[in-house]
């Protein structure tokens, strides 16, 4: 019988990544059978994030400090498989992992706190989570708050008893907030989710499943938003690392 409560670690350019075989492995790793949730910070790693780690010391420190770094991008998965031919690792997309965690939280009545997004998007996210999975949302805060309100927010998270805290503020803002909130409320699983609330509520269209399964979600985004071309060109440096064995 396969043990889903542990997972191997793989190293790419000095960064330790969890190797999950599939979504079920990820869920069983993070959520125990008795309903207990691991404490720590989840960070999705793709090629763009790998470049940010190299170029920005603050981002590097934030991401290296996170307990659970996993392969969100297909390019990162391919790099792991190239460097470790025996690795049984698959892409676990952050948006899909968030939905799976919310479904599991609803079934187990795990308290959830949502942070980030526009007020109307956050409200729609709450409504849909309750309707779809009966998620026990014990608090929320949109992304439009003042720096002086941060401490009060952290205390609200702590006092809510939340065991899962998801933060949709983009990188590195969400990683900074999760790090600081954990100093006040350490006993929870924190997950940075970027634009996931927008996708979940239908405000942003995600690539069709066939594109995702082919590892071409990046191409779909580029065709949908040609302005992303500059960001995509920067990823050529990652490809150079991959093909020259510098991972």
From Swiss-Prot:
MF-aspect GO terms: lipopolysaccharide N-acetylmannosaminouronosyltransferase activity
Pathway, per record: Bacterial outer membrane biogenesis; enterobacterial common antigen biosynthesis
UniProt keyword annotations, A-Z: Glycosyltransferase, Transferase
Catalytic class of the enzyme: transferase
A UniProt-annotated Pfam family: Glyco_tran_WecG
Catalytic activity: UDP-N-acetyl-alpha-D-mannosaminouronate + N-acetyl-alpha-D-glucosaminyl-di-trans,octa-cis-undecaprenyl diphosphate = beta-D-ManNAcA-(1->4)-alpha-D-GlcNAc-di-trans,octa-cis-undecaprenyl diphosphate + UDP + H(+)
GO biological process, one term: enterobacterial common antigen biosynthetic process
UniProt EC number: 2.4.1.180
Transmembrane region(s): none
Keyword hit for Nucleotide-binding: no
Function: Catalyzes the synthesis of Und-PP-GlcNAc-ManNAcA (Lipid II), the second lipid-linked intermediate involved in enterobacterial common antigen (ECA) synthesis.
HAMAP family: WecG_RffM (MF_01001)
UniProt family annotation: Belongs to the glycosyltransferase 26 family.
Designated name of the protein: UDP-N-acetyl-D-mannosaminuronic acid transferase
Organism: Enterobacter sp. (strain 638)
